[in-house]
């Protein structure tokens, strides 16, 4: 996204919308994960849109919080008040989910606030209006975000452990 300094990730999705056809995966660029997470997401039950979630004891202001109802996602956002999980920023779309997502992304970018929205705000909108967003837990598997320079040492160790596990397998 050449406009990353002026926009949020919804605009990046808009730029890539021509590639978002058929079945596809969408991953936040700052998310690191062990291979088993991708395997679990791909093997999840069929759904228009599937969001990977993790659960933990407490959540901070920067977490992308999620409210679930069984396997259904009811709400997602950093400021929602009721939540029971967090999104790790890794999603799977089927062809109909992809079409719905890109249509709403296009509509959102036509609004004044669209340039500053997260793409997960579109997922929240879809969950509220269409009830086609499901969740797949990756609880117990390792993942991390690369948000701050302080994250680098831990993330290097984590990635090295994944490589060692793969090489040793």
Outline where the language-model segments fall:
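Active-site phosphate/pyrophosphate- and oxyanion-stabilizing loops and adjacent acidic/basic residues
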Residues: 14, 39, 124
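Short beta-strand-to-loop acidic/aromatic patch adjacent to the donor-nucleotide binding site
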Residues: 22-32
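Conserved N-terminal catalytic core of the sugar/cofactor nucleotidyltransferase
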Residues: 1-24, 111, 167
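Conserved alpha/beta core of the MobA/IspD/sugar-nucleotide pyrophosphorylase nucleotidyltransferase superfamily
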Residues: 86-169
């Amino acid at each position: 996204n050449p406009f990353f300094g002026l926009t949020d990730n919804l605009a990046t999705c808009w730029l890539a919308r021509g590639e978002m056809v058929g079945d596809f995966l969408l991953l936040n660029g700052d998310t690191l994960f062990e291979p088993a997470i991708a395997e679990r997401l791909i093997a999840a039950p069929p759904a228009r849109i599937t969001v990977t979630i993790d659960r933990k004891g407490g959540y901070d202001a920067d977490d992308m919080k999620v409210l679930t109802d069984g396997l259904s996602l009811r709400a997602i956002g950093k400021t929602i008040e009721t939540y029971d999980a967090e999104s790790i920023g890794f999603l799977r779309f089927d062809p109909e989910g992809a079409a719905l997502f890109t249509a709403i992304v296009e509509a959102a970018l036509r609004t004044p606030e669209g340039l500053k929205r997260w793409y997960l705000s579109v997922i929240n909108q879809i969950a509220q209006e269409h009830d086609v967003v499901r969740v797949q837990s990756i609880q117990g598997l390792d993942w991390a975000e690369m948000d701050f320079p302080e994250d680098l040492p831990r993330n290097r160790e984590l990635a090295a452990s994944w490589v060692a596990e793969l090489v040793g397998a």
